[in-house]
């Protein structure tokens, strides 16, 4: 468990930069917030074992994943 934590853990400053990048890249702040929340919720139900481990909260993981996919416009599109 410790090795996974070290691989994907980011500090709060980096997480906030990623959140700001997501919001700035989106035309609609509310819509991107809902998309991140829905991804976190979906992830929570798809992989309940990760939640029990507690190594990374679903919302943090969703922000990291979506910010990594920022280069794909359909992720944050308004359609």
UniProtKB/Swiss-Prot annotation:
It is an enzyme of class 2 (transferase). The keyword Transferase applies. It catalyses: RNA(n) + a ribonucleoside 5'-triphosphate = RNA(n+1) + diphosphate. GO terms for biological process: DNA-templated transcription. GO terms for cellular component: DNA-directed RNA polymerase complex. GO terms for molecular function: DNA binding; DNA-directed RNA polymerase activity. The keyword Repressor does not apply. Keywords: DNA-directed RNA polymerase, Nucleotidyltransferase, Transcription, Transferase. It comes from the Bacteria. Its EC number is 2.7.7.6. Promotes RNA polymerase assembly. Latches the N- and C-terminal regions of the beta' subunit thereby facilitating its interaction with the beta and alpha subunits. Belongs to the RNA polymerase subunit omega family. In cyanobacteria the RNAP catalytic core is composed of 2 alpha, 1 beta, 1 beta', 1 gamma and 1 omega subunit. When a sigma factor is associated with the core the holoenzyme is formed, which can initiate transcription. This is DNA-directed RNA polymerase subunit omega.
């Amino acid at each position: 468990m410790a090795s996974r934590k070290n691989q994907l853990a980011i500090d709060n400053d980096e997480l906030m930069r990623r959140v700001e990048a997501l919001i700035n890249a989106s035309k609609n702040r509310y819509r991107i917030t809902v998309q991140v929340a829905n991804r976190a919720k979906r992830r929570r139900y798809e992989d309940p074992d990760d939640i029990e481990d507690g190594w990374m909260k679903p919302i943090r993981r969703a922000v990291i994943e979506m910010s990594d996919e920022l280069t794909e416009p359909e992720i944050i599109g308004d359609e």
